[in-house]
């Protein structure tokens, strides 16, 4: 029987299935950070349990870590709760162990969904979980990856398994050559704009088509990262030579005979040609334009040359109400041109867009424009996703380009993606952000978030408002 990529990985990891479809699934890799792990470790401690398989755990601190003040060490973490979570992770890993731990201030520390792939901890065919919804990022490697809750974090630590039911299969095919000036971020925002934030609910999405194959591994990670924003629990991209080339030589990747055996298996991780999907969505990549969200949901997105929608033109009452509420929160008027929206801050970073390719993309725009950050922009910050990314960017001189233009070059971490550390928006401030969520209060109470690509964010920083990066790139 022909199987999809999702079918193959699921079948390889099912330990037992009940009559109602509930299955026990074996977990290969458990990524751990400081926010959703303290209660789980405490649960193990109270029950007198140890980690079932220490070699499955890779940990780092990211959500609460500051992006400035590293010279002060742990004293640079201003918020007491944040500091306690970071130090508690240190203590828990010291007690329980891990295959790899990248603590605060270490060279390889960074966002968990950046350090996992770059360290070789994420491998094709794996089941990967983390107490974070954007674990779907790792699906770019042909791994079945999804977020879990805190109680499930403890369950995986104790048993190396999870309970769950198999999702349906969705295929999202993006065919054609992506236009100049458009990126993986524009692809995934266009997908979400088409199917909505509930379009993938109940599905695991496989992203395929020539436009997806043409993306780098970093671009594929951006797409899979936002599968959760399309409603899916997980996103997948089939393994190809790009996948294998990216992994080779990474610190935790297999070597020698084990590498050869792994590669032979990885090359089987593709959907069979005649595999059936429960739903198929198709997009023409040649028609995709730079995307900008205008509202308080990722599905509230339009092309850069578009306009803020008019609720009076929406026939569906619930959708009309959602538009009206979003307009009030975002402080926007119907029919306003997107390129007439001025901004207060710019954030280039997050697990969606903080890898070296993203840094290069943004720096290239800044260098091309040859101008400083606009006077109306209070803060433009660039936050690499890990110490490794930061070091590589500095070797290439990207930090010099950013700083010369008036951007702040920060230390790695989740930063302004979420209001859980010192980097946040004040009420009413408007931000061009390369992150993944534009919910009310996501970047700070009353903050207004517009999701864009790194290139679009860089161009907005210099011009002070949204512009079509294709005009300048």
Curated annotation (Swiss-Prot):
The annotated pathway is:
Amino-acid biosynthesis; L-leucine biosynthesis; L-leucine from 3-methyl-2-oxobutanoate: step 2/4
Enzyme Commission code(s) on record: 4.2.1.33
Q: How is the cofactor bound?
A: Binds 1 [4Fe-4S] cluster per subunit.
Catalytic activity field = (2R,3S)-3-isopropylmalate = (2S)-2-isopropylmalate
So where does [4Fe-4S] cluster get bound? 351, 414, 417
Q: Which UniProt keywords apply?
A: 4Fe-4S, Amino-acid biosynthesis, Branched-chain amino acid biosynthesis, Iron, Iron-sulfur, Leucine biosynthesis, Lyase, Metal-binding
**Which Gene3D superfamilies does the entry mention?**
Aconitase, domain 3
Q: What class of enzyme is it?
A: lyase
Q: Does the keyword Amino-acid biosynthesis apply?
A: yes
A GO molecular function assigned to this protein is:
4 iron, 4 sulfur cluster binding
Q: Which Pfam families match?
A: Aconitase (PF00330)
The biological processes this protein is annotated with in GO are:
L-leucine biosynthetic process
PANTHER family noted in UniProt = 3-ISOPROPYLMALATE DEHYDRATASE, HOMOACONITASE, MITOCHONDRIAL-RELATED
Q: Which HAMAP family match?
A: LeuC_type1
Q: What family is this protein classified in?
A: Belongs to the aconitase/IPM isomerase family. LeuC type 1 subfamily.
| Name of the protein this chain belongs to | 3-isopropylmalate dehydratase large subunit
Q: What is the phylogenetic placement of the source species in the record?
A: Bacteria, Pseudomonadati, Pseudomonadota, Betaproteobacteria, Burkholderiales
